[in-house]
């Protein structure tokens, strides 16, 4: 029972950062009286698309229309800096998903999704096709520890927009969203605490295990830095959930 937990015993400060929407960015935009939220990410959204899933809970709590466009096991970073047709799964990663919306073009991602054995890929693309970006008020971006687990570089100090790095994929995509739809408010939600499973099936603490590019909470701090740099809100689920 969380009601019985004395939070004062935890010496942890969350990295939450809520940034108000600049009203000037809404100039000329007609309020349709309905809040529409687009969810982008991976397993936190794609694992449960039913009434108990994260997107459904957001819809219930906010009385909003919510589109769940999360792809299973996708990542914030891309595998290749430019699209490689030999690795079609890059289409499901954040940068390319947003490019589909920006270009209003879903032919390639639909074809690739239909080749996947997991039906959730094709189901997500069908949801994407129904989204009217002119009506979207909020975009929520949430990825779990996949980028960390895969050993994706947390960042590229020489190129902050390197889409093959965790922060570069986020930064580039957020900048693209803001330039295309300046009226959309963006929330970046961090992964929760997680443990890494090695090839032997042994679990390792994400807070202390460095996969070669930092511990999981190193990725968390880097992610919050990107949100701050881009001027968007950040929700810390790592230290903010028990």
Tell where the protein language model's regions lie, with residue ranges.
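Non-catalytic propeptide/linker segments at domain boundaries
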Residues: 4-22
């Amino acid at each position: 029972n969380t009601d019985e937990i004395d939070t004062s015993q935890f010496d942890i400060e969350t990295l939450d950062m809520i940034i108000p929407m600049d009203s000037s960015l809404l100039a000329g935009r007609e309020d349709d009286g309905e809040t529409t939220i687009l969810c982008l990410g991976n397993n936190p959204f794609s694992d449960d698309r039913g009434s108990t899933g994260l997107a459904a809970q957001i819809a219930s709590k906010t009385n909003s229309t919510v589109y769940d466009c999360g792809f299973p096991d996708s990542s914030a970073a891309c595998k290749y800096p430019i699209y490689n047709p030999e690795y079609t799964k890059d289409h499901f990663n954040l940068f390319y998903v947003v490019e589909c919306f920006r270009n209003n073009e879903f032919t390639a991602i639909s074809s690739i999704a239909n080749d996947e054995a997991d039906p959730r890929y094709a189901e997500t693309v069908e949801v994407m096709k129904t989204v009217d970006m002119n009506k979207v008020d909020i975009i929520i971006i949430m990825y779990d520890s996949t980028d960390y687990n895969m050993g994706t570089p947390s960042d590229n100090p020489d190129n902050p927009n390197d889409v093959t790095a965790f922060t570069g994929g986020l930064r580039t995509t957020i900048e693209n969203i803001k330039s295309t739809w300046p009226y959309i408010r963006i929330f970046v939600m961090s992964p929760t605490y997680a443990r890494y499973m090695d090839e032997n099936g042994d679990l390792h603490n994400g807070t202390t295990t460095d996969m070669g590019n930092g511990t999981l909470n190193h990725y968390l701090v880097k992610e919050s830095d990107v949100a701050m740099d881009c001027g968007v809100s950040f929700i810390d689920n790592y230290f903010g959930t028990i």
